[in-house]
């Protein structure tokens, strides 16, 4: 997916933050994304689900590693909400699924947990997740 050649085009990665849901602008943004013919991968923010994790972390006293994992689950929840907005959207959890979705004319919406949980190259903290 990351390689470029005359036969392949790397998709544009678009972060759809939770603030779009809170301001009511998400449907319009998703309509624009769904209408594009440029290959796109949507990375959802965790939105209100991630906000809940942030609020619970100090009172429930869980560490950054668990907060990171829960934030990825929050991103998955937002992915599920995004895909019901348009038939072109499809939840994906691997590079192969991303490639398949793009090939099939779908807009992949990435749920990151399966790909990056436990990956030492990805910092387990709020800077890396929603």
Q: Where does each model-flagged region fall?
A:
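Nucleotide/pyrophosphate-binding catalytic subdomain
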Residues: 1-130
